Every structure is written in C-alpha cells, then in structure tokens.
Amino acid sequence: MADLWDDNDDDDDILELVNRPPMSQMAVPIKPPESQAEQLMKAKGEVGVLRQKLSMLEKTLREHDDNQKKLESSLKSSHEEEVTKLKIELERLEDERKFMLLEQKHLFTPRNSSKSETTHETETAEPSPIENKRRRMEPVKEYVTLTQNFKVDDGSLFYDHLLNFKLLGSEHTVLEMLDHICTYKTDLILSPEHKIIKARLPLGPPIRSLIFKWKSIYTLDQLVDKTLEILAIAIKSVSVLPENKLAIPFLISLMHCTINFRHSATSVSSLKDVFQFITDFIISDPKFLKQPLHESPLDLDVSPDVFQYSMLDQLCMTYSFDVLETCIVILLNCNTRAQEIVLNDATIAENLIKCCNFTLSISYKPIMPIIVNVTEILLGIVELDGAENVWKGKWAVLFSKLIQNWERSLTFDSVSLNFAGLNRCCGDNSNHSMIDNIISLEEVRYLPMIIENEFEPLTFTALDNLEYWSIQIQINITLIMHKLLHRYRSTLCSLEFLQKTFSLFSSHQELLLTVFLDRDHISDIKRQELLSVLLKLIYFCWVSISDEYKRALRLDELTICLWRIVYGWPESTDELSTEWAALINPLKALALEEEKKYFDDAYDEDNLPAFMHSEELDIKRESAVSKFNNNSSWPLRDMAKYILESITTMDEADSLYVAMVSET
C-alpha cells in the first residue's frame, strides 16, 4: 500500500490537472480553410439531394393527379350510369302513367246499352258540376302511328336497272339486243356456276340468268363486282376473233351501266380492274383513234360502201372512254387512300398516258367526243390528291399536247360521228336509228346488218352543240393548266406559253365582240366563261413571273383586252355609259337594218311593229353590253386592273383611252 501512494508518476499527472486553466480560457483549435474544389463538391451534393427531393415530390404529385383523374372518371361513369338508370326508370313510369290513363278511360266509359238507355236523359238534363269536372279530367286521345318498315332489295333494283337500260335513241334495251347476238366460233365460260355458252347461242339469256341468281345471294357491292367480272370475261373472250365484234359495244355499255348504278357500291378493287381492263382494250386496237388527218390521194377507195364495221369501232372507243371518265368521277368521291391505290399503279398510269397520246395527237384526226372524255379524265386526275407520285414526270409530255389542242380550233365535219355517248351527246344523235338497224330482231347473228354509208347533213342544233363542246374542251384544258402551274410553275411556265395564252384570250374576245355580238346563244355564255378562266390563268402567271419575263413579252393584244374589261363596265358612270353605247350601237344598227328588210312587204318604214322598237331599245342592247364587258365580276375586274396598271403608265393609259373611245 505504501508503494502505491508513493508513486511519483501519478503525482505528476495530478499536479498537471490541478494547474490546467479553465475551459473558457483555453484557445479553440482553428480549422484550416476549405479549398474551392471542396466547396464545389459540397454544393453539388446539396444540389443532388435537392433534386432527389424535387423528383420525389413531383412523383408524389403525379401519382396524386393520376388518382384524382381515375377518381373523376369513375365518378363520371357512375354518374352516367345513374343518369341512364333514371332515364330508364322515367320511361317506365311514363309508360305506366299512359297505361293508367288508358285504364281510367276504359273504367269511366259507359257501356253501349247503358248509353242507349240514358241518351234521352242526358239530352234533357243539365250536366252536374261533378260530371263537368270528370269530363275535363278525361285525357286527350293518343294514337300510335303504325309505320311499315319496307326493306329495300338493292339486288332487285340493280337487276331491274340492267334490264331496262337502253342506249340513247334506241327502241330496245341492251339485253334485248344481246338476245339476238351470238359468237362465231367462241365458247364462253362466264362463271364456274354456269354452263358453257356454246357458239351461235345468244349472249343475253345467260347473263340475265346469272345476275338473277346472284341478286338474292350476294350483297350489292359483291353483285356489282361479280357482274363486272362476267362482263370483262365476255368482252375478252369475244374480242379474240374480229367476227365477234358485234357484241362488244353493248357489253361495254352494260359495264358502264353497272358502275353508274350506285357509285358507293363500286369497290376500289373493281375500279382498279376496270381501269386496267378498259385501257388494255383501247391500246389493243387503236385504229379508230389513229385516223389520218388528211385523206391520201393514193387511196383507191375500192372497199364496199358500208359503215357497220366502222360504226362498231366508233361505238367501242366512245363507250370505253365514257367508262374511264365515269370511273374518275367515282374515284373523286373516294378517300385519298383509295385514289392512291388506283392512280399510283404504274401500269394504269402508263396505259392512261398512251390512251391520251392517241387522242390528243395532232397527227391524227381529232375526234371531239373522245377529246372531251380525255380532258374530263385529266381534269379529274389533276384534282386528285393521290396522283402526285407516279404522274409527276408524265405531265410534261401531256402539257405540250394539251397546248396543241388548246390553241387549235377543233372542227367536227364528219357526219358519221353523230352518235350519242354514254355520258353526253356532242351532236344531235341523228344516227341513233343505226344502232337498232345493226341488229336483226328476227334471228340470232354474229355479223352486223349492212348499214349504208349515207348520212344526213349536220343540223343547226348539232352545229350549236359542237361549238358548245369545243369551247368546253378549251375550258377544261385551261383549268388543267392552271392546276399544273400551281404545282410545276418553274418547269411549265414559259414565254411561248404566255404568248399563246394572250393570243387565245384576244381571239375569243374579238369573236365575241364582232362576229357573235348580235347573237343570243348559250355558246356565247360558255365563251364568256372561257374568257374568265383565261383571265385567272393570266393573272396567276403574271404575279408569278419576274419583271425580266414581263419585259420580254409582247403585250399589245393583252392591253386592249384588259382595257375592255376594266373600262367597259356599263354601270360605272354616265360618261362611260355613253361611250360604250357609242361603240356598240353602230354595230347593232347594221344588224337591225337587215332585220327591217324582212318587214318591208308588210309594214311601212315609219310604221314598224312595236316589238321592233322595243328590241332596238332594250333587248339587243343589253345583250351586246353583257358581251362587251364579258360579264366580268368585280374580282375579275380587279385582276384585269392590276395587270393593266403594271403594264402601262398613266400617260399611256390616257392615250389608249382617247384612241379607243373617240367621239363619233
């Protein structure tokens, strides 16, 4: 024990602790300052923590929003179910109320016997207040109308449509004509469901029996597809031998009747097959389209003077192009996907280009009905949205051919072409009797009856219709060019094209103001429509080309034409009214003097009938004025004024005004 208390080491430690200063007086150890890298690392760590907390908060809010949306949808669906149940319950209660009213009426209605016994009493006695109240409480009679639901049989309607189909001007239906037409040496197999049609047997009965059998089996679209299929099989089988040509135009007309029955019933696949089939048929025998422009002096013309075979070729081509045009019309009502399926097919596009080249070529004789078909087809294609890919490189070739047919005047001097098509009649259809005469109704034949090559001259009605459709061709071509220039402005718009447009615009306006000024005809209205679309085309090209292009153009004809539109407005001012009357009245006076000569024998010069004076003062003057200003609307006048102001200066405009409106 003494040794433990005597330890010097422990004493030293105790003394050191006793002598240590208090904690408040001891110096705090100073930490070395942190470096910038450590501070940046610390800040990044804090940012990471904050981001993690923010993401967790966003996740929590997102889950809360999802839960709220689910709750809202569930509440909404439950609310809708409750509303539906309440509506059903309300309808049930309404039915019960009506039933109770009917029961009440039945209970309060007296029997016939009691009514007959008390009739005299009710007539003499006054009604009591209770009876009046009861009478007022009686409900109004309600009647339930019974409507019969008729189910329309589309198949039977389609079958009747084919049975009653006639060509324009014909006395017999097409199927009746096919009842007297057979094949030469060709056996037909229209369908596996039908037996073979032997040669020298009529074609009408098997076609009729097949469609009659299918109309109760298939739906309308399936029936249309099957009918088009058997007609295509018949045409392809019959066209192998030239002796079987008699049946072809009538089968093509039935194909047109089939697709034209109801456009919505023709499927896209059927349209594509019809396009392919008809274009192949046209290309296989285009001799009718390749008639020489001029007769050869070396032609001996020793063939028989008959017309039936040329007539069959003409009807086949005309009806084929009518079918193509109708297919385009149906395709215009389809969606973009269907349009792409048909028109973006390379084979169909190539065949259509070949058919158009045959028709629009200036090396061959122009056939006006078919040219109308081609322009309508191209106008429909250029308006379709799905015909951009395959047709992009083909419009350049067609554009040149369209210009050639655009600037030349189409004449129709062949009386042999005066037949009506399936879509329109470009003449007066004076040759319609030949369609019935080519068929023998007394026997079944594969050869046509002999038709002599003798025709009546074209009537005034036919010539007027031909003029109308020739102007319509130019309108269609103008619209096609306008659409194409919107897409391919840089490649198609040229100086030559613009000069031809100016010349065509000037020539038609000159015809309207000189040759046809005294005429009141529907073709004049169509010509004014042509001038309107030409002006729109000129305006579009004018605002699209550069000033360098404009300086290279010859603008004298265009300037005069535009001045007539801008300053030939009859309702602008009294001064202008006097001036346009001064321009028109001398021309009208010459025509009126010619008309007065017809009345020299019946009337004196001073005692002309009253209608002559009214005609002099009102009717013809108004007709001439409308032609002079081209029936231009305000937008067209603004277009013409814009072009005219960019062409001429103010001094040139004043000089032109003085030169054209001189005092007489």
Swiss-Prot record:
- Residue ranges of region Disordered? 61-81, 109-132
| Keyword DNA repair belongs to the record | yes
Tell me the compartments it is located in: Cytoplasm; Nucleus
Keywords carried by this UniProt record: Chromatin regulator, Coiled coil, Cytoplasm, DNA damage, DNA repair, Nucleus, Phosphoprotein
GO CC terms for this protein?
cytoplasm; nucleus
Gene Ontology terms describing biological process: chromatin organization; DNA damage checkpoint signaling; DNA repair
Coiled coil residues, start to end: 38-107
One Pfam entry name: LCD1
Q: Does the keyword Lyase apply?
A: no
Q: What quaternary arrangement does the UniProt entry report?
A: Forms a complex with MEC1.
UniProt function note: Forms a complex with the serine/threonine kinase MEC1 which activates checkpoint signaling upon genotoxic stresses. The MEC1-LCD1 complex is recruited to DNA lesions in order to initiates the DNA repair by homologous recombination. Required for cell growth and meiotic recombination.
Name the record gives this protein: DNA damage checkpoint protein LCD1
Species this chain originates from: Kluyveromyces lactis (strain ATCC 8585 / CBS 2359 / DSM 70799 / NBRC 1267 / NRRL Y-1140 / WM37) (Yeast)
The gene for this chain is LCD1
